[in-house]
Amino acid sequence: MKLNKRFFYGVLTAVALLAAGCSKDNTDPVPDPGTGEQLVENPKVRAAVRTMMSEAARTESTLNGVAVWQEEYASSGEWPKGSDNDTRRQMWSVTKTFTSMAVGIAVGEGKLSLSEKVAPMFPEEVAEAEKNMTDAQKANLEALTVRHLLIMANGHKKDPTVEYATEYFKKDPFGSLKYIHNEWVDVSGLLTKHDSTLPELFFGYPFDAAPGEKFCYDSFSSCMLSEIITKKTGETMADYLYKRMFKPMGLDRPEWEDIHGVTAGGWGLHLSTDEMLAFGRLLLDGGKWDGQQIIPEDYLKEAVKDQIKDRMNNGQNYSTTGYGYQIRTRSDGSLYMAVGLFGQYIVVIPDKKAVIVMTSAMPFDADNILKDLSKVMALLNGDLDSSVKPLELAWKYIVPEL
């Protein structure tokens, strides 16, 4: 984890590397990054993590990082394929949960209300968009609140992110290839390449449903929350959240993409597994870090509850029943998770007082992109996602040992 307390993490890294090269578990205590307590790894979890990563390697899984923290123990982790606990990777939609916490902090500071209407914040963009709307669509837009954006019920019936990205890619496929890199896809760069701002694109998409009635996963909702944070605070969301969350936790400034100078709220955050663990612990502890209340507790309690129904992985041990404030939730409160494309996860299991984080690579070869062009198009159409496999492995090996 990129912390200012470099000594702690130098020790942790050394221990992790030593453990990875040994045939038995390391029992030497290490300082906990959140409390400074001297802790040792849970040997059962340590063994489970190794076994999980061994199976991932055998099955050619794209999993490239897993780390586990449980109260009273030091964290355990494995980072194959040339990466380690300090390697930052694209979080994809895990970013959305961080966006939600920025909203929560702004609410706590009195700068924003969840019941506040969105349209009056963007008068020029809304006036232009309404020229092409029916009366019903105008009414839907004018009813839209900040809370509707948080729970993915903004009145769109489809996710415009996929549609716009596909449209731009098809217009200039070879020019768009430069935005596809080995470890990540620069969606923000692809959108910035075009003149339209994100609010213009968002308001220009049909509002055919009444806000709050229908769940529709929509990354532009998250990006609009970032736009709102900037309007209400005068800062980019990346700067705002760094000062109020990352820095107080001892974390370095995050790598975060922007669209026309505005922090990408729906994707674009790059984190290491240690940074992901720290965030998961922050959520688990009710928004506190080392005794300091960073996220308002009342906001966080609502954020991790089912606010709208939307089942994911139905019938599995890791299933979720709904969506909170930019996070997948379970109605009984036993599980909530930030989920990103291709297998990025921050999983919080309150009754186990544990956090599991996982990162995964993209399932296509960016160095020979023409060979895998069909996979790229499947990605843009929302049809390519290998994210279930890491959860299966985690519930097979890690969760039983917690």
Regions found by a protein language model. Give the residues of each.
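Short, charged, amphipathic alpha-helices and their helix-cap/turn boundaries
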Residues: 73-78, 119-120, 163-210, 235-254
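Active-site-proximal alpha-helical segments within enzyme catalytic domains
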Residues: 221-228, 267-288, 344-361
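Bacterial Sec-dependent N-terminal signal peptides
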Residues: 10, 15-43
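Active-site helix/loop module of the DD-peptidase/beta-lactamase fold
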Residues: 109-161, 204-206, 210, 220, ...
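A short, well-structured edge-of-sheet supersecondary motif
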Residues: 52-83, 346-347, 353-357
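Structured C-terminal helix/loop/strand segments within mature extracytoplasmic catalytic/sensor domains
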Residues: 335-402
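Active-site Gly/Thr loop motif
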Residues: 251-253, 301-355
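Active-site SXXK
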Residues: 72, 89-115, 149, 225-229, ...
